[in-house]
Amino acid sequence: MQRFSFSCYLHWLLLLCFFSGSLLPSAAAWWRGVHEVRVTDLFKDLQCDNLRAKDAFPSLGYALSIGQSRLSYMLQDWLLAAHRKEVMPSNIMPMPGLTPDCFDHLESSSYAPFINAYRQAILSQYPQELQLEAINCKLLAVVAPALYHNYHLANLTGPATWVVPTVGQLHYYASSSIFASSVEVLAAIILLFACIPLVTRVYISFTRLMSPSRRTSSGTLPRRKIL
């Protein structure tokens, strides 16, 4: 009987491992796809040569965790590149700049500590560049990593081609990020409810096998009475 119960337990354990092994790669691929699509599309709209978004950012989470210090350098280099026009061709619209309202919006974001530290320095160092076309600054956290790698990679591999995203495109990225987060929550709920029957069935079978009421004191199952 112990051998039988162990074999049943091993059987359910193998089934659970099989379903987990088949679901986890799909879930991991879906997770990477959801987080990569916005960064990939952003690089396509920027049309940056000599750069593949998937090689630069495995996931959007990694892109946004690039670090406050690197982002601060990006802000300065972004404005400096717009001032010198080293990276941008002269036949396209100017690179969108930063306005004081941008910093007000960013003060409520996760970049607030470093933004407040660099605010006065940037405002005093690049006063003319702040008059460029303003962007939706709440989306700067999404655009900044792409611009940062675009600009610095151009210094290493040659000039890059810039096509600045429009305000409509930036609004699209914001809505897509909100949509993606809601889809992630919905998919997690669906996956949870899909796993509940399997886990419940394994638990019931395991408790039935390990229930002491089905065993006698000698460890054998009671025989049925023959009428």
Swiss-Prot record:
GO terms for biological process: clathrin-dependent endocytosis of virus by host cell; virion attachment to host cell. Keywords: Clathrin-mediated endocytosis of virus by host, Disulfide bond, Glycoprotein, Host endoplasmic reticulum, Host Golgi apparatus, Host membrane, Host-virus interaction, Membrane, Secreted, Signal, Transmembrane, Transmembrane helix, Viral attachment to host cell, Viral envelope protein, Viral penetration into host cytoplasm, Virion, Virus endocytosis by host, Virus entry into host cell. It is found in: Virion membrane; Host endoplasmic reticulum membrane; Host Golgi apparatus membrane; Secreted. Residues 29-177 are virion surface. InterPro entries: Equi_arteri_GP2b. Residues 1-28 form the signal peptide. Disulfide bonds join 48-137. It is a single-pass type I membrane protein. Residues 199-227 are intravirion. Glycans are attached at residue 155. The chain crosses the membrane at residues 178-198. One of its GO terms (cellular component) is host cell endoplasmic reticulum membrane. It comes from the Viruses. Minor envelope protein. Part of the glycoproteins heterotrimer GP2b-GP3-GP4 which is probably responsible for the attachment to target host cell. This attachment induces virion internalization predominantly through clathrin-dependent endocytosis. Belongs to the arteriviridae GP2b protein family. Translated from a subgenomic RNA (sgRNA2). Heterotrimer of GP2b, GP3, and GP4; disulfide-linked. The GP2b-GP3-GP4 complex associates with the E protein. This is Glycoprotein 2b. It comes from Equine arteritis virus (strain Bucyrus).
